[in-house]
Amino acid sequence: MKINILTLFPEMFDIFKHSIIGRARENGFLHIETINIRDYTLNKHKKVDDYPYGGGAGMVMTPQPVVDAIKAVKEKNKGKVIFLGPRGKTFNQEMAKELSKEEELVFVCGHYEGIDQRVYKYFDLEISLGDFVLTGGEMACIPVIDSISRLVPGVLGSEESFQDESYYDGTLEYPQYTRPFEFEGEKVPEVLMSGHHENIRKWRRKQSLLITKERRPDMFEKIKLSKEDIKLLKSK
């Protein structure tokens, strides 16, 4: 997958040089490039913002450098142009799965009090992380790209690595344990030590359902429970 990020702060994305995403880039599964919007401004002082018409606090990103940056990138990246903003669709795992199927994506990060409205016609999709305010689009862009990238074939090495995780199938993840067997008087559930794969699978499924029901009833209501699921929930 090829990802271009249009931003005023390219250095904020150095995080993608490390860990799993960094290795995926080295191995050719991901190509991530940052583009500094400021490089496209025609203002001799390199300004990319100005006061809002009608008054109000803060500054607004001017349309010219953003649009020119988008046009330049689109010459080599035909992917969807995605803007991170509070008016967008709330990002979730299902959206991450759909976007991970794309070969190319372009992300635009806003800053200050936002971007001139006349730029919005260049966006194919607007994404929001939720009902809260961040200091800039970069903060939202990082988890969105991370979530999408890890679903790209080859990035995690094994599809099984993410199939059991929270949200993948509409449930929260089951509890995980590792050594030692006993810690501060609390022992690992015996079923996980049994070596009986079917019993372990059922235990994990039941725990996922119970945790989802308790902590995210809104998610639980959307789950199409199988006969086995119903039986597991009724069992002690």
Swiss-Prot record:
<dbReference type="InterPro" id="IPR029028">
    <property type="entry name" value="Alpha/beta_knot_MTases"/>
</dbReference>
<feature type="binding site">
    <location>
        <position position="110"/>
    </location>
    <ligand>
        <name>S-adenosyl-L-methionine</name>
    </ligand>
</feature>
<dbReference type="InterPro" id="IPR016009">
    <property type="entry name" value="tRNA_MeTrfase_TRMD/TRM10"/>
</dbReference>
<keyword id="KW-0489">Methyltransferase</keyword>
<comment type="similarity">
    <text>Belongs to the RNA methyltransferase TrmD family.</text>
</comment>
<keyword id="KW-0819">tRNA processing</keyword>
<dbReference type="InterPro" id="IPR002649">
    <property type="entry name" value="tRNA_m1G_MeTrfase_TrmD"/>
</dbReference>
<keyword id="KW-0808">Transferase</keyword>
<feature type="binding site">
    <location>
        <begin position="129"/>
        <end position="134"/>
    </location>
    <ligand>
        <name>S-adenosyl-L-methionine</name>
    </ligand>
</feature>
<dbReference type="Pfam" id="PF01746">
    <property type="entry name" value="tRNA_m1G_MT"/>
</dbReference>
<protein>
    <recommendedName>
        <fullName>tRNA (guanine-N(1)-)-methyltransferase</fullName>
        <ecNumber>2.1.1.228</ecNumber>
    </recommendedName>
</protein>
<comment type="subunit">
    <text>Homodimer.</text>
</comment>
<dbReference type="GO" id="GO:0005829">
    <property type="term" value="C:cytosol"/>
</dbReference>
<dbReference type="InterPro" id="IPR029026">
    <property type="entry name" value="tRNA_m1G_MTases_N"/>
</dbReference>
<dbReference type="GO" id="GO:0002939">
    <property type="term" value="P:tRNA N1-guanine methylation"/>
</dbReference>
<dbReference type="GO" id="GO:0052906">
    <property type="term" value="F:tRNA (guanine(37)-N1)-methyltransferase activity"/>
</dbReference>
<comment type="function">
    <text>Specifically methylates guanosine-37 in various tRNAs.</text>
</comment>
<keyword id="KW-0949">S-adenosyl-L-methionine</keyword>
<dbReference type="InterPro" id="IPR023148">
    <property type="entry name" value="tRNA_m1G_MeTrfase_C_sf"/>
</dbReference>
<keyword id="KW-0963">Cytoplasm</keyword>
